[in-house]
Amino acid sequence: MSDKINLMNLTRQQMRAFFQELGEKPFRADQLVKWIYHFGEDNFDHMTNINKKLREKLKTVAEIKAPEIAVEQRSADGTIKWAMQVGDQQVETVYIPETDRATLCVSSQVGCALACTFCSTAQQGFNRNLTVSEIIGQVWRASKIIGNFGVTGVRPITNVVMMGMGEPLLNVANVVPAMEIMLDDFAYGLSKRRVTLSTSGVVPALDKLSEMIDVALAISLHAPNDELRNEIVPINKKYNIKMLMESVNRYLNVSNANHGKVTIEYVMLDHINDGTEHAHQLAEVLKNTPCKINLIPWNPFPDAPYAKSSNTRIDRFQKTLMEYGFTVILRKTRGDDIDAACGQLAGDVIDRTKRTAQKKRFGKEIGTHQIY
């Protein structure tokens, strides 16, 4: 393992401090960040506005290292899924091009501890948190492949969603700095409305998030009552729907990124959570929370105990919610032919603990609020 500092682990402010420690002017950090993220450069020799002496010094103490591509799969609909190598394991990153945008779905952990029953990632177990460089490096690597680095007015990626493998709010220490780089005008310069963090509801971390960063928020709700959510989203046993929605409203009260509305994500599981009675219950849960609702057709994975809701049931569910005045969008399934659709990401995870032991550890950490 290299003892050089990976500059992708540093925000621009941290990099300014790094250059000061080297006896250099802090503005060198601004130059370097622009080279790395705006131009996609990882070779110090190519950074022509930095003097040769400093470039040689940097080569002895620092490196610029992003995850490498292990496997690439391309869908018939244009979606691309990459398995990215992080140490001896792999996480998955998905690029979703559309007419007016290009979205990158980024992973935050190797595996996931939350054990949501309808999600393929959760079945892999949990290994570790990704570092800042492994998170922002997914964006860098994808941008490098897609191209258009440094082309004025052209962005290879217009939106980033923290909706890949893992629970972002259980890795705040690395997710937040990575998102800061996404927002930094010297790096990717994305609008805070174009960077979305999706969470299953780690309430203490969500309450602290607004003190650290302002980005768009999506809530993986998936059930309209505690009894059902306890079964399919087990973190609900610790932080129930009432606690979660109160935390969401607190975040919305101080956030500018969300236009006053949160996105509610709701996977459609046949005869599990897709009945008309569930729609009425969901409307009651959300009546005091400004939101838009994304209905997500469930995407199958091996040995899963669920079936996808029929179009008839989805349509009835959607119309019931719309009668209450909610904005309800049916998410178009993308990349399902390469297992890149929502809930299908798996990667290559070495589960460090058996699932029951992991759940006990997870519950202890959450109980003491040691969340990052």
Curated annotation (Swiss-Prot):
Subcellular location: Cytoplasm
Domain Radical SAM core: 98-337
Binding site for S-adenosyl-L-methionine: G166, E167, S198, S220, L221, H222, N299
One Gene Ontology biological process: rRNA base methylation
GO molecular function terms attached to this record: 4 iron, 4 sulfur cluster binding; metal ion binding; rRNA (adenine(2503)-C2-)-methyltransferase activity; rRNA binding; tRNA (adenine(37)-C2)-methyltransferase activity; tRNA binding
Co-factor binding comment: Binds 1 [4Fe-4S] cluster. The cluster is coordinated with 3 cysteines and an exchangeable S-adenosyl-L-methionine.
EC number(s) recorded for this UniProt protein: 2.1.1.192
Annotated TM spans: none
Domain of life of the source: Bacteria
Summary of the function given for this chain in its UniProt record: Specifically methylates position 2 of adenine 2503 in 23S rRNA and position 2 of adenine 37 in tRNAs. m2A2503 modification seems to play a crucial role in the proofreading step occurring at the peptidyl transferase center and thus would serve to optimize ribosomal fidelity.
Protein name stated in the entry: Dual-specificity RNA methyltransferase RlmN
